[in-house]
Amino acid sequence: MESVDTELTSFNNMVAKSSYPVRILHHNNGISEDEEGGSGVEPYVGLEFDTAEEAREFYNAYAARTGFKVRTGQLYRSRTDGTVSSRRFVCSKEGFQLNSRTGCTAFIRVQRRDTGKWVLDQIQKEHNHELGGEGSVEETTPRPSRAPAPTKLGVTVNPHRPKMKVVDESDRETRSCPGGFKRFKGGGGEGEVSDDHHQTQQAKAVTGTEPYAGLEFGSANEACQFYQAYAEVVGFRVRIGQLFRSKVDGSITSRRFVCSREGFQHPSRMGCGAYMRIKRQDSGGWIVDRLNKDHNHDLEPGKKNDAGMKKIPDDGTGGLDSVDLIELNDFGNNHIKKTRENRIGKEWYPLLLDYFQSRQTEDMGFFYAVELDVNNGSCMSIFWADSRARFACSQFGDSVVFDTSYRKGSYSVPFATIIGFNHHRQPVLLGCAMVADESKEAFLWLFQTWLRAMSGRRPRSIVADQDLPIQQALVQVFPGAHHRYSAWQIREKERENLIPFPSEFKYEYEKCIYQTQTIVEFDSVWSALINKYGLRDDVWLREIYEQRENWVPAYLRASFFAGIPINGTIEPFFGASLDALTPLREFISRYEQALEQRREEERKEDFNSYNLQPFLQTKEPVEEQCRRLYTLTVFRIFQNELVQSYNYLCLKTYEEGAISRFLVRKCGNESEKHAVTFSASNLNSSCSCQMFEHEGLLCRHILKVFNLLDIRELPSRYILHRWTKNAEFGFVRDMESGVSAQDLKALMVWSLREAASKYIEFGTSSLEKYKLAYEIMREGGKKLCWQR
């Protein structure tokens, strides 16, 4: 489903700023070579280009005439084949990552058409800053001012020259990596710590030289040495902190260097928040984009770091990228942590393994796996799923929740669940796990194992915590899936970080996050909010803004989440049946009881959907159509949208050929309005509210347009099979989509077994029903050639 960002004008103007062009024909864009270079041609919706690069060059030329600079913004990829489907080119002052940026929203977006051409389909010309004169220079990446090249003790810190090694010739003794880290060579002997022959020494800091946002380095190695030298002058020690990887290709995009007293993992640490973060630029260099110089402990200026810097091979990626760093403890010894922590008690393994083996005798499709520690062969994480869960994943695994509620409190058992939402919008179990620790390795193993158990069927979207190990594992196992942060975790961090702000800001913050409808509107309101309260330098606000695609509703609406609420808390699948105080001897019985209760609720909804008919509230044929197809719960949601559509006014604002644009406004509420685009040639429709993209159900705005156009039956593309009464057998529709014969047979076995269990349940409720069920089986058996 393709998202469409739409910016609306006022209802009285009855014209939308951005729309998809219809039948736009240009020969060579209608622009001569001279015009492209410097005439007064301005960008407009419908302008065509042969390539995205040609569009960028055109926008650069326009920017040079107008007086601003350009950066390459977001790109969007096809969910079908991963090719780039659209690109954004933005004003260089877009965002707030650097002090020079003002949150400007000016941009153009070009979209690839089926013909291979690129068409300008969205544009914003207004800037929120003063524009320069004629001849401004193109800027595709931010180029902030560089640091001067100070010297001390014959050492030069030269951020101007990429790949420049910073070496102190006055001290050539071997040093280890900063902050208690050593480079661990996997290719050497077991537990071997490498002493690289080529050694790079710590750069001596220069009096008066401090890190600042915008400082550039040729490599991450150079940045690390600079920060360590600075730390020696100021009086603290450095550790290498988190790294962040690209969701596209997995390459490292940013790194953090932190005070050695950051965190609370050891007695010597006290939660110090001082750090420096560097971000990779398109040029290959690195730039300081975030910085906190404040420490919460006493400093000791001039005190040497116990651990210096070893030279890290420069592989062209800026150093540090290809090196595994094993953290040493802070107690002075040099023993490497060879084993991971295990939060699962040893007594759990025999209990669970016995249970799994007994289940496999009853359920041929029962799956379980145990992770083994590569160092000592001990058991680590555990995953299991019965045949019902595996079958449910084939139907309702398109959007899932990785629930780690045990992390909220003092749970003694690290029990996690993977859940989906069925055609009754009820949670369904897709798998369970005991997570040994919260490392990337643990989550990577878990997601890969779940994917194997589900025959490789990948979700389109995932709701999970925003912790770095989980993010890294998700990107690696499910590339392309939209990761949405858990609402409870976002709320917790908001409560923690919004305490110092005035109540007026909190009110406007909530309004900005949860009431803006489009991406353009959110970015504009956020920019105004930050400027109003002078908060461009606030570290937390910068961080959450950079991660807005993972939690801001306006950015989530274009992705399918099967109706999982954006703002609400998702209740644990097992509720209060399994909690922190569940004793070992009762875990299995409580687990089975709660699971059976959930599945009984699902069976009741199946029965109600097939045997109960809700009352119709209109005389519209589409209501009768959807009553026949949808489950009871989903139909009521659709029915409410249909009834609410009567409270809206609809006005055509644009028409060209088969394409029309409508503005749909609520009666008595000028502020609630949305744009609907409709194609008469194929009945395709899209709405700026993006309800269909997000939930898979048509919104009241499109239904209003359909009513106006006298469309009496919904096109089949708008009736998602996953919401229908027979959604459980939807895998039959995918039989020719590349599913292997073995996986297809497994799906058929699970499907027939589930149908048979329901058949037996109803057939044994009375003697009369038993006779009827037996007769039906006999007749069916004849068709299957069971009987001769």
Curated annotation (Swiss-Prot):
Tissue specificity of this protein: Expressed in hypocotyls, rosette and cauline leaves, inflorescences stems, flowers and siliques.
Pfam families linked: FAR1, MULE, SWIM
Covalent S-S links between cysteines: none
Induction line: Up-regulated in hypocotyls by far-red light treatment.
GO cellular component: nucleus
Domain of life: Eukaryota
Residues of the FAR1 domain: 57-133, 225-301
SMART domains the UniProt entry points to: ZnF_PMZ (SM00575)
Annotated segments matching region Disordered: 127-200
Protein name (database record): Protein FAR1-RELATED SEQUENCE 12
